[in-house]
From Swiss-Prot:
Alphabetical list of PROSITE patterns matching this protein: RNASE_H_1 (PS50879)
NCBIfam families linked to this entry: PRK00203.1
Example of a GO MF term: nucleic acid binding
Name by which UniProt lists this protein: Ribonuclease H
Keyword list, A-Z: Cytoplasm, Endonuclease, Hydrolase, Magnesium, Metal-binding, Nuclease
Self-association and partners: Monomer.
PANTHER family: RIBONUCLEASE H1
Cofactor, how bound (note): Binds 1 Mg(2+) ion per subunit. May bind a second metal ion at a regulatory site, or after substrate binding.
Organism: Polaromonas sp. (strain JS666 / ATCC BAA-500)
Gene name in the database record: rnhA
Residues covered by the RNase H type-1 domain: 10-153
Length: 159
Protein backbone atom coordinates (compact mmCIF):
# COMPACT_ATOMS: atom_id res chain seq x y z
CA UNK A 1 0.00 0.00 0.00
CA UNK A 2 1.88 3.07 -1.21
CA UNK A 3 0.85 6.38 -2.64
CA UNK A 4 2.96 8.12 -5.25
CA UNK A 5 2.84 11.90 -5.29
CA UNK A 6 5.02 14.10 -7.48
CA UNK A 7 7.47 11.26 -8.10
CA UNK A 8 8.00 10.41 -4.43
CA UNK A 9 6.71 7.37 -2.64
CA UNK A 10 5.07 7.83 0.75
CA UNK A 11 3.77 5.16 3.04
CA UNK A 12 0.02 4.73 3.26
CA UNK A 13 -1.59 5.54 6.61
CA UNK A 14 -3.47 2.58 8.10
CA UNK A 15 -5.45 2.60 11.34
CA UNK A 16 -5.79 -0.75 13.10
CA UNK A 17 -7.85 -1.84 16.09
CA UNK A 18 -7.16 -5.26 17.61
CA UNK A 19 -8.68 -7.27 20.43
CA UNK A 20 -8.66 -10.73 21.92
CA UNK A 21 -11.32 -12.61 23.86
CA UNK A 22 -11.35 -15.80 25.87
CA UNK A 23 -14.17 -17.72 27.54
CA UNK A 24 -12.21 -19.16 30.41
CA UNK A 25 -8.50 -18.54 30.65
CA UNK A 26 -7.47 -20.95 29.26
CA UNK A 27 -10.48 -21.81 27.18
CA UNK A 28 -11.94 -21.15 23.74
CA UNK A 29 -10.69 -17.82 22.45
CA UNK A 30 -10.90 -15.45 19.54
CA UNK A 31 -9.12 -12.50 18.01
CA UNK A 32 -10.48 -9.61 15.98
CA UNK A 33 -9.00 -6.93 13.75
CA UNK A 34 -10.42 -3.80 12.15
CA UNK A 35 -8.15 -2.28 9.48
CA UNK A 36 -9.01 1.11 8.01
CA UNK A 37 -7.32 2.97 5.17
CA UNK A 38 -9.24 6.10 4.36
CA UNK A 39 -12.82 5.03 3.66
CA UNK A 40 -11.84 1.39 3.09
CA UNK A 41 -12.22 -1.07 5.96
CA UNK A 42 -11.41 -4.74 6.36
CA UNK A 43 -12.40 -7.04 9.21
CA UNK A 44 -10.51 -10.17 10.23
CA UNK A 45 -11.21 -12.68 12.97
CA UNK A 46 -10.37 -16.20 14.04
CA UNK A 47 -10.15 -18.38 17.09
CA UNK A 48 -8.70 -21.40 18.83
CA UNK A 49 -10.47 -24.04 20.92
CA UNK A 50 -7.99 -23.87 23.83
CA UNK A 51 -5.95 -20.71 24.36
CA UNK A 52 -5.49 -17.70 26.64
CA UNK A 53 -6.59 -14.09 26.42
CA UNK A 54 -2.99 -12.88 26.07
CA UNK A 55 -2.36 -15.26 23.18
CA UNK A 56 -5.48 -14.00 21.41
CA UNK A 57 -4.48 -10.35 21.98
CA UNK A 58 -1.08 -11.11 20.44
CA UNK A 59 -2.53 -13.12 17.57
CA UNK A 60 -4.80 -10.21 16.65
CA UNK A 61 -1.81 -7.89 16.31
CA UNK A 62 0.20 -10.48 14.37
CA UNK A 63 -2.67 -11.13 11.94
CA UNK A 64 -3.27 -7.40 11.48
CA UNK A 65 0.34 -6.63 10.60
CA UNK A 66 0.65 -9.74 8.43
CA UNK A 67 -2.36 -8.55 6.40
CA UNK A 68 -0.45 -5.45 5.26
CA UNK A 69 1.30 -6.30 2.01
CA UNK A 70 3.59 -3.25 1.82
CA UNK A 71 5.24 -1.01 4.41
CA UNK A 72 2.70 1.36 5.95
CA UNK A 73 2.44 4.06 8.58
CA UNK A 74 0.34 2.28 11.17
CA UNK A 75 -1.59 3.65 14.10
CA UNK A 76 -2.40 0.52 16.09
CA UNK A 77 -4.97 0.72 18.88
CA UNK A 78 -5.08 -2.11 21.41
CA UNK A 79 -6.47 -2.54 24.90
CA UNK A 80 -3.72 -4.92 26.01
CA UNK A 81 -0.93 -3.34 28.03
CA UNK A 82 0.72 -6.78 27.99
CA UNK A 83 1.15 -6.61 24.22
CA UNK A 84 1.91 -2.87 24.01
CA UNK A 85 4.52 -2.85 26.76
CA UNK A 86 5.86 -6.23 25.69
CA UNK A 87 6.65 -5.11 22.14
CA UNK A 88 7.77 -1.55 22.97
CA UNK A 89 9.60 -2.04 26.29
CA UNK A 90 10.11 -5.55 27.65
CA UNK A 91 11.17 -7.32 24.45
CA UNK A 92 14.61 -5.69 24.35
CA UNK A 93 15.57 -7.21 27.71
CA UNK A 94 13.99 -10.55 26.85
CA UNK A 95 16.04 -10.82 23.67
CA UNK A 96 19.25 -9.75 25.43
CA UNK A 97 18.66 -12.48 28.03
CA UNK A 98 17.90 -15.20 25.48
CA UNK A 99 14.11 -14.88 25.81
CA UNK A 100 14.15 -14.95 29.60
CA UNK A 101 12.55 -12.54 32.03
CA UNK A 102 14.50 -10.47 34.54
CA UNK A 103 13.74 -13.28 37.02
CA UNK A 104 15.40 -15.72 34.57
CA UNK A 105 12.12 -17.51 33.83
CA UNK A 106 11.27 -18.38 30.21
CA UNK A 107 9.15 -15.69 28.53
CA UNK A 108 5.54 -16.83 28.21
CA UNK A 109 4.16 -16.99 24.68
CA UNK A 110 7.69 -16.81 23.26
CA UNK A 111 6.52 -18.31 19.95
CA UNK A 112 4.15 -15.39 19.41
CA UNK A 113 6.61 -12.78 20.71
CA UNK A 114 9.19 -14.01 18.20
CA UNK A 115 6.66 -13.87 15.34
CA UNK A 116 5.53 -10.39 16.35
CA UNK A 117 9.13 -9.19 16.72
CA UNK A 118 9.99 -10.51 13.25
CA UNK A 119 6.96 -8.76 11.73
CA UNK A 120 7.74 -5.47 13.44
CA UNK A 121 11.46 -5.46 12.64
CA UNK A 122 11.34 -6.74 9.04
CA UNK A 123 8.11 -5.25 7.67
CA UNK A 124 9.20 -1.66 7.17
CA UNK A 125 6.05 -0.47 8.94
CA UNK A 126 6.25 2.64 11.09
CA UNK A 127 4.00 1.70 14.01
CA UNK A 128 2.51 4.04 16.59
CA UNK A 129 1.33 1.76 19.42
CA UNK A 130 -1.65 3.31 21.22
CA UNK A 131 -3.39 1.87 24.25
CA UNK A 132 -7.15 2.37 24.45
CA UNK A 133 -9.31 1.48 27.43
CA UNK A 134 -11.35 -1.59 26.57
CA UNK A 135 -15.15 -1.68 26.84
CA UNK A 136 -15.25 2.09 27.20
CA UNK A 137 -17.22 3.06 24.10
CA UNK A 138 -14.37 3.53 21.59
CA UNK A 139 -16.08 2.51 18.31
CA UNK A 140 -13.00 0.85 16.78
CA UNK A 141 -12.22 -1.09 19.94
CA UNK A 142 -15.85 -2.17 20.28
CA UNK A 143 -15.83 -3.50 16.70
CA UNK A 144 -12.57 -5.37 17.27
CA UNK A 145 -14.08 -6.83 20.45
CA UNK A 146 -17.19 -7.98 18.56
CA UNK A 147 -14.95 -9.61 15.93
CA UNK A 148 -12.92 -11.35 18.64
CA UNK A 149 -16.15 -12.73 20.07
CA UNK A 150 -17.08 -14.00 16.58
CA UNK A 151 -13.72 -15.77 16.66
CA UNK A 152 -14.70 -17.43 19.96
CA UNK A 153 -17.95 -18.59 18.37
CA UNK A 154 -16.03 -20.01 15.41
CA UNK A 155 -13.64 -21.82 17.80
CA UNK A 156 -16.68 -23.33 19.51
CA UNK A 157 -17.98 -24.52 16.13
CA UNK A 158 -20.96 -22.17 16.13
CA UNK A 159 -19.95 -20.18 13.01
Amino acid sequence: MTDTQAGTTTQTQVVIYTDGACKGNPGPGGWGVLLAMGDTEKELFGGEPVTTNNRMEMTAVIEALAALKRPCRVTLYLDSEYVRKGITEWIHGWKARGWRTAAKAPVKNVDLWQRLDALVTSSGHKIDWRWVKGHNGDPGNERADALANQGVERALGRR
